[in-house]
Structures are given as structure tokens and as C-alpha cells.
Amino acid sequence: MTAAASTPLRLGLRENLAQFSLLVGVNALVGGMIGQERTVLPLLARNEFRLTAFTATLTFIVAFGSVKAVTNFFAGTLSDRVGRKPVLVAGWLIGIPVPLLLMWAPTWGWVVFANVLLGINQGFTWSTTVIMKIDLVGPQRRGFAMGINEAAGYGAVAATALATGYIAEHVGLRPQPFFLGVAYAGLGLGLSVLFVRETRGHAQHEATLHSLKTAHASDGEAVDRLPSTKEIFMLTTFREKALSSCSQAGLVNNLNDGLAWGVFPIVFANAGLSIGRVGILAAIYPAVWGAGQLYTGGLSDRIGRKRLIAGGMLTQAAAIGWIAATHGFTQWALGAAVLGAGTAMVYPTLIAAIGDVAHPAWRARAVGVYRLWRDAGFAIGAILAGILADAFTPAAAIWTVAAITAASGIVVIGRMYETHPAASRAQIHLPGEHVTTA
């Protein structure tokens, strides 16, 4: 008998700490890949490629969000079929050309193409690191684990946005700011190939602890079978109240992020702020977002998911409205910090709620569907903000997004039920599973 066969798989953060910590580091590198664009690319569009229309400038976010959304869906399906690690490695291979294209792109079309590749890279790598951590920790500390995961990723987004802003102010918008991306891609690929281990077996082990039931039809009859991908899509998008509530909230959350990524830097620069100060503002939002998740992820394990999701969406709406209504570095810095706090309440909690409800046997695909809708928010937000900013004013676009965000929070309040057993009197009801309270 081999050592691997004689050692039973164990769920839990402490039991899998080394591999979990490695995946946190890998996810930080994933975040750094997107962070290299947060400050520089909107300014590159305006200053070097002479794009004046918001709809033209934001095409890179539309390309990124559309491709990442679809890739998320396939990442979940592929990771169930071929394993998590091959999908992770493929994502890093696709990401290697991205910083090189951004350095030397002769036209804006090449920048858009680089973001197509970045969308695939992010969809494969971030999805699989999320799924792998969920596999490893089991159900008890899922929110805490997602908080650490997202804190690492968005902490790296913030640090890289700040660093690239500093570099760009002193030596130019390119190529030097994108040297960081070259280092991130090489290190991420090396760690994933050499040290990351497959975790699909942990999900299969957890699945043996659950009854495999799902809705057979609209009458809710439960049957012991694995649902089809189409059924999982419908459950996560429409039919299951908690899953669908999380999907719409995730979409609106990233609609906000698309606005912050593509519109805010141009608004700040047009107001006369230096590239360095724009970089600071671009970093504050993901920095608070990232650091806050270290607390909010674990908090959702104690007080439940619903309150944090609804409260976070309403906090984001207030912050976006504040940014639209005020002017100046200090006021905008405050708005960015509050926006980051609201996002920190929502981001790890949404993915933890998906993990609460979805059965381990089809959880990766449910995560993929959720992330499809969530990252479609990038594209929808860029299109909406671009059209409104060009037709009216950037302020009109920002106010509209604030209203949509508030409406999303109200939907969560009215439709979602609490999914975490520690915060709910009843046990979690899987789709179609008939559960009685103790």
C-alpha cells in the first residue's frame, strides 16, 4: 500500500495548512496580474492612444469581463472533469503573454486582445484557487477561508496598483510598470506546476458525508442523482433563492468594480490629480476590500451570510453616491475606503454562501455559474457606464450604478434566506432536499 493510499484525506484549515497557504500565495500572484492594469490602463488609453470616448476606453474591461465570465463557467466544469490543477496551470500558461502585449501594443486593439487573454487567465486561475481552498477546508470555516483567499488576491491588486502608479509617474506609463506582471506570471506558473497538489479528492471525500439529492422537477421531488450542468445553471441563476440572490449580487458588485476600474481613474485625472495620486485612490479601494475580508469572512461564519451581503451592497451604494456628490482627493479617498469596506462585507460571503448550499459533488460547477454572472458585471458595468458617461456625464453614470447597487441589496433582503447553519435555526435545505428541523 502506498503512503498516499494509507493516509486518509482530512478536511480542515489546520489539517491542510501548508497547501492552503501555498494557494493563498498563488492567488496573490493572480491578483497582481489584474492589479498591473488598475491605475495605468485607463490613463494609457487617454494619454497614449488618445481615446476620448468612455465607450472606447472601456472596451478593454468589456473584453476582460465577457471572457472571464465565460471562462469561470468552464473552469468549474473542467475542474470537476479533469481536476483542479490542470486548469490552474493552463490559466498561468495563457497569462504569460499578457504583460508583454501591454508593454508593446502598437494599437488599442492589441490592448483589448491582451485583456481577452487576461480574462481567460483570471477565470481559470482565480476560480480554481477558490475551488481548491473550499475543497481543503470543509464546511465549518469556509467563510474564513474565502476571506483569506480574497484578501490575498485583492491585497495584491492594491499593492500592484499603487506600485504601478508610482512607477508610471516617475518613468512613464509603459513598459516599466508591466515588468511586475512578467514576474507574477513566471512565479505563478512555477509554483503551480511544481508545488500545488490536486484537491479534487477532498471534494469527493466530503461528498461521501452528504446525501446526494437535487430537485427532479418543479414539484421538488428529490432523487439520488447528480444534476446536469443545465440544472445547476438554472438553480444557481433563477430557481434556488439563495444561489440566485448571490448571483445577482455578485454581478452588481463587479459592475461597481468595473466602474471603479475604468471610470474613476479618468474622473480623478480630469480633476487635475497627478498619476501618483490617482494610483493612491485606485489602491485604497482594493486595499480596504482585501484587508477587510480577513475579518468579514470569519464574521460570516459566526453571524451568517445574509446580513453581511445585504449590508455590504447598501454600503457600496452609499459610497458610490458619495464619490459622485463630492470633489477632491480627501473626499474621494474616504469614498473609496467605504466602497472597499462594503465590498469586503460582500465578496467572501457570497462565495461562502454558494459553498453552503451547493453539494460537494456539483459545487465546482455552481461556483463556476456564480462566477460567470459575477464577472459578467465587469462587461455590463463598462458598457452601461460608458454609454451614460458619453451621453450625459460621468456623474450620471456613477449615480445610476449607485441606484442599481441599492436595489440589489433590497433584493437580497427580500429573497435570500440564511445559508449558514450556525446562524440559522433550520438546517440548510439543498435544492429539492426535504430537511426537518431538529
Label every model-predicted segment.
Residues 71-83, 168, 292-304, 389:
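Helix-to-loop junctions at the C-terminal end of transmembrane segments
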Residues 2-17, 202-246, 428-438:
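Juxtamembrane intracellular "pre-TM" segments in multi-pass secondary transporters
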Residues 176-193, 398-414:
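Symmetry-related core transmembrane helices of the 12-TM Major Facilitator Superfamily/SLC fold
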